[in-house]
Amino acid sequence: TLIGTTESEYTGGLAHPSITAAEQAYLLDMASRYFQRDLGVHDVVWTFAGLRPLLAASLDDPKSVTRDYVIDFDRSGPPLLSMYGGKLTTYRKLAEQVVDLLAPALGLASSAWTGAIPLPGGDMPDGDFAGFLAQAQVSHGWLAPTLLHRYARAYGTRIGRLLAGCSQVTDLGEEVLPGLYAQEIHYLRTVEFARTAQDILYRRSKLGVHLAADSEKTLDEWLA
């Protein structure tokens, strides 16, 4: 279960923000209201923190802070577009508005299209995952069912690209961590731009949540 978020003013270094003890206690207290027992720090298997800029209409009034983004498009000279704020849940809307503003300046035609286009790997017929998984079991029956299901859920129709050249488990290469083979690592680095163990274990997947505490160190050493 993923719980969050908190909103606290942050004054530390920008490179490696982390959750504070007070924020963790707040989230555990809030979540405990919905469980039969109280949650404690020992129940937490992973935490992450991020920072986002917020715009205030008045520095004297914290309530004036907006969680939305602001686009400033200066047409007085060469087109200059600046974006402020924004969040994960509005990234697509923001990107479409930016492209719509910039396209005419670049002599390009543009209209919103992302709402009707599936994400990479999501182009399975009629969005039928069960049918897709059944076909994958025929094509890649040599894989353990749990591993095949994870690949199908994570990569969708790109599973063929992930498993290109593989017809048996040994073709996946070294099992660097439980359930994580060299073949998948190579795919994530070359196709999904992963660079570090943290990229692979948390940003491209959530495998790190279910692995031993030293898994990130083990993978970083393997990647070196």
Give the residues covered by each predicted segment.
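C-terminal catalytic lobe of FAD-dependent flavoproteins
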Residues: 1-3, 7-223
